[in-house]
Swiss-Prot record:
Miscellaneous comment text of the record: On the 2D-gel the determined pI of this unknown protein is: 5.5, its MW is: 62 kDa.
Superkingdom in the source lineage: Eukaryota
Protein name: Unknown protein from 2D-PAGE of needles
Length: 15
């Protein structure tokens, strides 16, 4: 399940 979390994710690297 994909949860929309409001925290820096290490898996979602978009810097």
């Amino acid at each position: 399940h994909e949860e929309q979390i409001t925290q820096p994710s290490a898996t979602n690297d978009e810097a």
